[in-house]
């Protein structure tokens, strides 16, 4: 899509990404100026106690699989640097420069900018125990750090040199050595390679390399960055269907389609007139609007794979993406979310967000600050967009809404990026509240992206709203991989029902030839029917937030809804304690698993 736009010679330009520090009218008139000045004061204290990154902390990943402690300290430095930079930009008094310079210097003295969990040169190979300082790796957060330091230079370079002559050159030199030179001279898997599958790494890293190049690379090198970036984005786009569905889930939209938006926007600025026509492509608009279609109500989104149901509030970047592709629904969702965050959230800029990697991109902060007034003004008059039903054939996801109910059904395969073995699973909401849930994923560890991934309970089909065969014996669950997929998938014309054969997702199960699941949503609730030729016992799992109460053939999920069950041999329930910090961001300390045992036929009517 993009590379074909470069068949003719094109010119590049050094883009203007934001007003210079000298434009005091632009910076001092920002509606968030006082908020950022206050954040800077807090950041001064944080900078004095900025965490160390000793070798022992790096080694925890290799030795115990714990990646969280290193990442907490690593990201804290970068969030603090963002706050100091924004505070200095809105005040321009030099108050924050000493702490900012010290912290930027410390980041430049880190042995590596990549995470321990990403310390490998070949995709899907074991991480090396230590970084090779002579051969930098450009991973997600080396690229993020390069963009951060480059943006500090682009915004405050002259001020830093006035404070410490030569400091800006040192900072730019580290960006060149650790990010730009490796990008030009080495091949990292996320840069794209023919038909090799890509994921959110591709646009995310590409966006940040372009930010670094736009502010640190000499003008004569820009064409090389543009050409490689355009190729990489094409490699990312090839893995999306024309319907625009993100197989990684709503939570990864901000790292996938949304970083692609900024990458495309940067390409348009760096190569004027070359790529602008891409914004009119239906596929790009569909990718933009995916997040609108997955939204249930309030903070909740339909979730599959590693995605959390709390996929995060939309904000300025989504608004700008919607504006670029002419999507009023996306602009509306984003503007209303951002206005609500500004009104009620004491940390709207995510400087203290539970997800440590939030709030570390200085360009995002500038982008949001410059558009904040426009977005909040738009929110005052924007009426909520009416949600609609959608079928995403590329991934096999149905979103259906009837009355108080919203249904998410997943067909597809077990080869998604961030995959869980969840073919055929359903999630159900009533009145915007979760009824049948997808638990999501625990805090990332060494095991999460390793051959042992499916030892983690949240990845297994037995902990989704799916059947398990021979539950008291062999416990046959689904298997990972593209071959383990739904078959004979049909969707109703009204987009209120989905049917499929789940048997292929389980591989070789003795006696299993067919497992037909059908779901149908009406204004009064959900009907789910499962039929199989498997001769033995099957246990259907239902995961819920509400505590189930069994009364004969009825399962009540608190006061939210009840399931009338036909065909059950027995029904058992268990409490599932939730202690993991990542899961606790979305769920209370206890979830519930209902197991409905049956043979060959089962019917549920939930309402």
Where are these regions (language model features)?
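Long, well-ordered core segments of solenoidal/helical folds
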Residues: 43-54, 100-118, 166-191, 224-244, ...
């Amino acid at each position: 899509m993009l590379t074909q736009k470069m068949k003719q010679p094109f010119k590049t330009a050094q883009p203007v990404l934001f007003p210079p520090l000298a434009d005091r009218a632009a910076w001092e008139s920002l509606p968030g100026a006082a908020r950022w000045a206050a954040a800077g004061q807090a950041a001064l204290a944080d900078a004095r106690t900025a965490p160390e990154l000793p070798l022992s902390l790096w080694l925890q990943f290799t030795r115990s699989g714990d990646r969280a402690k290193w990442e907490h300290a690593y990201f804290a430095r970068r969030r603090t640097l963002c706050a100091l930079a924004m505070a200095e930009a809105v005040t321009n008094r030099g108050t924050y420069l000493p702490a900012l310079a010290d912290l930027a210097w410390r980041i430049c003295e880190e042995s590596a900018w990549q995470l321990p969990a990403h310390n490998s040169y070949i995709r899907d190979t074991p991480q090396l125990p230590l970084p090779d300082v002579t051969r930098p790796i450009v991973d997600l957060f080396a690229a993020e750090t390069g963009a951060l330091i480059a943006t500090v230079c682009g915004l405050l370079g002259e001020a830093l040199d006035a404070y410490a002559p030569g400091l800006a050159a040192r900072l730019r030199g580290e960006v060149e050595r650790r990010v730009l030179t490796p990008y030009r001279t080495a091949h990292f898997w996320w840069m794209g390679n023919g038909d090799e599958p890509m994921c959110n790494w591709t646009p995310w890293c590409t966006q940040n390399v372009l930010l670094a190049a736009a502010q640190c690379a000499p003008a004569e090198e820009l064409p090389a960055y543009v050409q490689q970036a355009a190729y990489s984005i094409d490699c990312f786009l090839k893995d999306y269907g024309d319907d625009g569905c993100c197989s990684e889930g709503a939570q990864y939209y901000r790292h996938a389609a949304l970083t692609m938006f900024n990458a495309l926007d940067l390409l348009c600025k760096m190569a004027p007139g070359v790529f602008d026509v891409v914004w009119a492509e239906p596929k790009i608009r569909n990718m933009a609007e995916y997040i609108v279609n997955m939204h249930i109500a309030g903070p909740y989104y339909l979730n599959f794979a590693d995605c959390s149901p709390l996929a995060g509030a939309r904000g300025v970047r989504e608004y700008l993406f919607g504006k670029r592709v002419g999507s009023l629904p996306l602009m509306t969702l984003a503007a209303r979310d951002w206005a609500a965050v500004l009104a009620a959230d004491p940390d709207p800029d995510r400087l203290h967000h539970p997800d440590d990697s939030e709030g570390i991109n200085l360009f995002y902060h500038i982008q949001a600050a410059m558009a904040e007034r426009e977005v909040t003004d738009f929110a005052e008059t924007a009426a909520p967009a009416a949600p609609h039903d959608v079928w995403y054939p590329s991934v096999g996801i149905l979103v259906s809404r009837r009355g108080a109910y919203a249904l998410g059904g997943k067909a597809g395969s077990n080869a998604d990026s961030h995959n869980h073995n969840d073919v055929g699973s359903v999630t159900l909401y009533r009145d915007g509240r979760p009824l049948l849930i997808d638990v999501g994923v625990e805090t990332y560890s060494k095991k999460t992206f390793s051959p042992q991934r499916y030892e983690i309970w949240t990845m297994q089909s037995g902990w989704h709203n799916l059947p398990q065969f021979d539950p008291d014996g062999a416990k046959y669950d689904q298997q990972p991989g593209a071959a383990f997929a739904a078959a004979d998938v049909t969707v109703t014309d009204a987009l209120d029902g989905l049917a499929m054969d789940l048997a292929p997702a389980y591989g070789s199960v003795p006696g299993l030839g067919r497992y037909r699941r059908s779901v149908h949503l009406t204004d009064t609730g959900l009907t789910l029917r499962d039929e199989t030729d498997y001769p033995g016992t099957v246990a259907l799992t239902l995961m819920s937030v509400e505590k189930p109460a069994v009364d004969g053939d009825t399962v009540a999920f608190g006061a939210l809804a009840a399931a009338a069950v036909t065909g059950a041999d027995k029904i058992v329930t268990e409490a599932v304690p939730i202690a993991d910090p990542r899961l606790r961001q979305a769920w209370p300390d206890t979830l519930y698993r209902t197991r409905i045992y049956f043979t060959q036929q089962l019917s549920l009517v939930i309402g």
